């Protein structure tokens, strides 16, 4: 979205502007050849990567059946939207930036602004739809399995486009100021104060608030589940240490006699002290049995551990199994912490990228129309802010698809042309 067109940030005349621009007597910046070459290369690369990345996501979902589910339909629709931004909007925006003035006429300018606002708003709202789908999936997993249908995904996608139309169309119907069309070399969004508030809050600030709330609740729900799992593991480990272990049952042979393996019983512990049991489990014909169990006293003697009769029970859990349970519990705790850190990292990347790309743009979009006469925006800074927002269409497929292993496998198949051989 172009709030500040190239060369429009400063109406005063200067001999040399930032990044190789020169202002002429009318205040409209001319550009040097080096500026045009460098800008063309940078923006051309960005557009090419955005088109390629989003096209690969769409192709992967269309060709790989394992990716054809409701969650990925939303990601695929986001990729289609960002592909539209890359194909319909960015080339005209790049031409505007390279030439440093609008040369395509007023009708094309109106169409460009409408497509710009429509596609960028829909892209942002797709991120909200994905967040909402993930929120329902993690907070109500049992019921949402039946509700998570293609029809529901289609309804969410349609809503994103409807809101985009409601925000992009009003300027074409006259919700603008007379000054918006006063300069034939400029093509910027409507600076009407009412439309500025309506469009910025509808396209960004309300979706941003919704995403912060949803991902905050997703994080709390995920952390609660992870910690609940850890507590269950710890409780199970504690119960196994405190509880008695039942004696192994001895199977009878065909003639009705007990198995040949005998239990050693009746050891007498006269000296007292700390006993530590060490055992080895062996699978025999008559089932699993603790065959060699010895007691090591902290003193010098060595005795056999009293073992249970058929109706008896081992008086204490063997240390070998206690340590094993403790190791398992510790491993589960570490895995849970790793999952929690991964959740924080993933949500941080999603929200951090979105805010980094769009917040500077929408701050300028909201503030500039109210203080245009007194605010000074350097040309280079305005260009960076505009293209930082556009770059979100390049980063979305990386965040939502390329980090996913299923998508990675599909991309490998595409690169190796495995789908072509079917």
Swiss-Prot record:
Residues 1-38, 99-107, 175-193, 371-378 are extracellular. 1D-myo-inositol 4-phosphate binds at residues 345-346, 352, 403-405. Disulfide bonds join 109-187. G-protein coupled receptor activity is regulated by lipids: phosphatidylinositol 4-phosphate increases HTR1A-mediated activity. Its main location: membrane. G-protein coupled receptor for 5-hydroxytryptamine (serotonin). Also functions as a receptor for various drugs and psychoactive substances. Ligand binding causes a conformation change that triggers signaling via guanine nucleotide-binding proteins (G proteins) and modulates the activity of downstream effectors, such as adenylate cyclase. This is 5-hydroxytryptamine receptor 1A.
């Amino acid at each position: 979205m172009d709030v500040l067109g190239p060369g429009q940030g400063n109406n005063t005349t200067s001999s040399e502007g930032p990044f190789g621009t020169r202002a002429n007597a009318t205040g409209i910046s001319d550009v040097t050849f080096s500026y045009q070459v460098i800008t063309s290369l940078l923006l051309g690369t960005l557009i090419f990567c955005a088109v390629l990345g989003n096209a690969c996501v769409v192709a992967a979902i269309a060709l790989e059946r394992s990716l054809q589910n409701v969650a990925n339909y939303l990601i695929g629709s986001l990729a289609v939207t960002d592909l539209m931004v890359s194909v319909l909007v960015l080339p005209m925006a790049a031409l505007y930036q390279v030439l440093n003035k609008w040369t395509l006429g007023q009708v094309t300018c109106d169409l460009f602004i409408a497509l710009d606002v429509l596609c960028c708003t829909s892209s942002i709202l797709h991120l909200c739809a994905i967040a909402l789908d993930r929120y329902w999936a993690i907070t109500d997993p049992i019921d949402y399995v039946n509700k998570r249908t293609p029809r529901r995904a289609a309804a969410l996608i349609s809503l994103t486009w409807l809101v985009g139309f409601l925000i992009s169309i009003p300027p074409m119907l006259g919700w603008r100021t007379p000054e918006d069309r006063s300069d034939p070399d400029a093509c910027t969004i409507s600076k009407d104060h009412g439309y500025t508030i309506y469009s910025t809050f509808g396209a960004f600030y309300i979706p941003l608030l919704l995403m912060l709330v949803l991902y905050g609740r997703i994080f709390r729900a995920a952390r609660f589940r992870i910690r609940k799992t850890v507590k269950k593991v710890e409780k199970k480990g504690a119960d196994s240490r405190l509880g008695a272990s039942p004696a192994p049952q001895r199977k009878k042979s065909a003639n009705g006699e007990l198995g040949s393996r005998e239990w050693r019983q009746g050891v007498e512990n006269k000296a007292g002290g700390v006993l530590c049991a060490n055992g080895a489990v062996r699978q025999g014909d008559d089932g699993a049995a603790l065959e060699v169990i010895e007691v090591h006293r902290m003193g010098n003697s060595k005795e056999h551990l009293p073992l249970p009769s058929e109706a008896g029970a081992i008086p204490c859990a063997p240390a070998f199994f206690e340590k094993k349970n403790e190791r398992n519990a510790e491993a589960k705790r570490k895995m849970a912490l790793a999952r929690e850190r991964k959740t924080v990292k993933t949500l941080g990347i999603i929200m951090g990228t979105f805010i980094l790309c769009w917040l500077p743009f929408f701050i300028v979009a909201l503030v500039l129309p109210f203080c245009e006469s007194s605010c000074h925006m350097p040309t280079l800074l305005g260009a960076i802010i505009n293209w930082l927002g556009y770059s979100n269409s390049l980063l979305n497929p990386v965040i939502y698809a390329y980090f996913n292993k299923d998508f990675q496998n599909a991309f490998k198949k595409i690169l190796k042309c495995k789908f072509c051989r079917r």
